[in-house]
């Protein structure tokens, strides 16, 4: 027996633009989108902010699920069907922007945008891969701009559920240099300013380091700062917003997300829906550094939040079906190591030696910048 629940996907936004498109309804056992163009919905009574919505219907099983069989580990490097570098910088694929919407509040320290590009099935990526973007124009030497890689923020089915779109989560880079001049990142500003209907040159897909585990019983610990949330949104959509014949997540997905302010939180409404749908399978903890502190008065960075669950995390790391993924600012890596050093030492284990073993077993996966 199956029932259908409404799972509207809402992206908090004060600025949004969209390109009329016909969304699709694929097989009834998977995610099903209503027909129509993208649109605004202004019903967030708490903040009064405008909300961009993609309405979806998620089919879920109400019967007791059949226990999943233990999945034999296969190296991601040898995983079948994973495509890399179908499109390269010299011959990129030209996609089209369907949607570009700002998903941080106006008072957030910096802008982050969610964008959806069509690829007509020509860039068949997996959750955890990246795509390259080549900004329009030329550099100061008169040459085309170099490729900039971005982690994919959508599942392999894409936000429209038809395997023909790819989504990115991009922060607009603007800073002041030593001479007091305002500098804008070429590719991030190109993307954040991209109008729906515009062409965009894409390369890839690339990468196998961050591919999500195939084991539906796995414990997946995700550590993200800012736009490092992108690959984990792709994981979580597959786990909780889609139904697949060959995959039903029965494990534990635990997300730690670090941001500076509440107004910088990304995809919070989606994560709230996931928690409501699968409270036993999904946990999320936020670390809001400019607004929260621990008992010692220290700012709440991602490693500070993790320290509150240190013993529990260490016990999970002892299991052979626990996988850790880290994506975002490189600075968080040392803080996380500092926590683990003392925990491992309590068991007479050298953390850095143990981490090497985890990496070799593909249970410790890092993509930082």
Curated annotation (Swiss-Prot):
Residues annotated as domain FAD-binding FR-type: 90-212
Topology in membrane: Peripheral membrane protein
Pathway terms, separated by semicolons: Energy metabolism; photosynthesis
Catalytic activity annotation: 2 reduced [2Fe-2S]-[ferredoxin] + NADP(+) + H(+) = 2 oxidized [2Fe-2S]-[ferredoxin] + NADPH
Organism in which the protein naturally occurs: Arabidopsis thaliana
Family to which the UniProt record says this protein belongs: Belongs to the ferredoxin--NADP reductase type 1 family.
UniProt keyword Phosphoprotein present: yes
Positions with a binding annotation for FAD: 148-151, 169-171, 175, 186-188, 227
Disulfide cross-links: 187-192
CDD domains: CYPOR_like_FNR
Name assigned to this protein: Ferredoxin--NADP reductase, leaf isozyme 2, chloroplastic
Function: Plays a key role in regulating the relative amounts of cyclic and non-cyclic electron flow to meet the demands of the plant for ATP and reducing power.
């Amino acid at each position: 027996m199956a029932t259908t629940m409404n799972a509207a996907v809402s992206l908090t936004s004060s600025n949004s633009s969209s390109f009329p498109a016909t969304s699709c309804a694929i097989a009834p056992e998977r995610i099903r989108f209503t027909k129509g163009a993208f649109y605004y919905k202004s019903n967030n009574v708490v903040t009064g902010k405008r909300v961009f919505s993609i309405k979806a219907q998620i089919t879920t099983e109400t019967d007791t699920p059949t226990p999943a069989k233990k999945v034999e580990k296969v190296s991601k490097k040898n995983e079948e069907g994973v495509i890399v570098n179908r499109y390269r910088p010299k011959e990129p694929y030209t996609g089209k922007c369907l949607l570009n919407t700002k998903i941080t509040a106006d008072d957030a320290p910096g802008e982050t945008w969610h964008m959806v590009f069509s690829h007509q099935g020509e860039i068949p990526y997996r959750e955890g891969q990246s795509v390259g973007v080549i900004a329009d124009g030329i550099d100061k030497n008169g040459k085309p701009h170099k490729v900039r890689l971005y982690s994919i923020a959508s599942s392999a089915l894409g936000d429209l559920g038809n395997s023909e779109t790819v989504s990115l989560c991009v922060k607009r880079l603007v800073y002041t240099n030593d001479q007091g001049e305002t500098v804008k990142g070429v590719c991030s500003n190109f993307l954040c300013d991209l109008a729906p209907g515009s062409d965009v040159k894409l390369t890839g897909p690339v990468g196998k380091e961050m591919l999500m585990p195939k084991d539906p019983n796995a414990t997946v610990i995700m550590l993200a700062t800012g736009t490092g949330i992108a690959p984990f949104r792709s994981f979580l959509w597959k786990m909780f917003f889609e139904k697949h014949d060959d995959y039903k997540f029965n494990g534990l997905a635990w997300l730690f997300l670090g941001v500076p302010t509440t107004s910088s939180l990304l995809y919070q409404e989606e994560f709230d829906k996931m928690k409501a749908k699968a409270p036993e399978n999904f946990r999320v903890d936020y670390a809001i550094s400019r607004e929260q502190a621990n008992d010692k008065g220290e700012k709440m960075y991602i490693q500070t939040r993790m320290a509150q669950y240190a013993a529990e995390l260490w016990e999970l790391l002892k299991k052979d079906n626990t996988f850790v993924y880290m994506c975002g600012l490189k600075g968080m890596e040392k803080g996380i190591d500092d926590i683990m050093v003392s925990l491992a030492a309590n068991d007479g284990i050298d953390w850095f030696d143990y981490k090497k073993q985890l990496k070799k077993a593909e249970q410790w996966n890092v993509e930082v910048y």
